[in-house]
From Swiss-Prot:
Cofactor detail note: Binds 2 calcium ions per subunit.
Keywords for the protein's UniProt record, in alphabetical order: Calcium, Disulfide bond, Glycoprotein, Metal-binding, Secreted, Signal
Protein name: C-reactive protein 1.4
Disulfide linkage: C62-C125, C112-C144, C207-C241
Length: 242
């Protein structure tokens, strides 16, 4: 396994998320993980995507994450535009319920059958379609209770905004809150401009053969999309399924 020396505290560097991760183990493919240390003003550990998203009328957002502490609301994915500070937002509250905001519409809040365990990797997928406003959240391959229709129905998510991982933006690229930050680890975050079916999502959530488990995002692809790291975020090898 190759060693990666991540960004130091207070620096910003470009991360190419799979420069050194090309081999595989029998028990699970080696991939990259990003560690977010605790936030405290003025330090807000985060990844900021280089570039923006296109207009979107359907999405699937999937990722693996591990929580170190669950004392308050944890923000995983925040996409803001000049017109809307919650164009797309996903988070986990301390009671264990997942939230998804789309285009500032009333948020989807669901309680999932699989409890989130501190220090354990979990796989999460969010889907949304503008056509009927159908939104779902699933954890570890299982649908959560409370999936709904009528969420931002007929809406198009606008291009031109900023994607931030690990912090919630209250303005584009700013106004972060330490009480809404991720303290933990994140891996294999991918975004598609379509809704994946249940079987595809189940494959992504399992420690299966890489050809079955990995369906790479066509909007954000973890091993190719470029990010900047701030305030002590560290990239290292990771074996999710080991």
């Amino acid at each position: 396994m190759k060693t990666f020396h991540g960004p130091t505290f207070g620096t910003a560097v470009f991360l190419y998320l799979l420069l050194f991760l090309t081999s595989a183990l029998e028990e699970g493919e080696i991939t990259s993980k990003v560690k977010f240390p605790p936030s405290s003003s003025p330090s807000f550990p985060r990844l900021v995507m280089v570039g923006t998203l296109p207009d979107l009328q359907e999405i699937t957002l999937c990722y693996w994450f591990k929580v170190n502490h669950l004392k308050s609301t944890l923000t995983i994915f925040s996409y803001n535009t000049a017109k809307n500070d919650n164009e797309l937002l996903t988070s986990l509250e301390k009671q264990g319920a997942f939230h998804m905001n789309v285009h500032g519409a009333p948020q989807l809040k669901v309680q999932c059958p699989n409890k989130i365990h501190i220090g354990k990797w979990h796989h999460v997928c969010h889907t949304w379609s503008s056509w009927e406003g159908e939104a779902t959240i699933g954890v570890d391959g299982f649908h959560c209770k409370g999936n709904a229709t009528g969420i931002a129905m007929g809406v198009t998510l606008s291009q031109g905004g900023l994607v931030v991982l690990g912090q919630e933006q209250d303005s584009v690229g700013g106004e972060y809150d330490a009480e809404q930050s991720l303290e933990g680890e994140l891996s294999e975050l991918n975004l598609w401009n379509t809704v994946l079916n249940h079987e595809q999502i189940k494959h992504l959530s399992k420690c299966a053969h890489p050809s079955e488990r990995h369906i790479h995002g066509n909007i954000i692809q973890w091993d190719k999309t470029q990010f900047q790291a701030y305030d002590g975020v560290v990239l290292s090898p990771n074996e999710i399924c080991a």
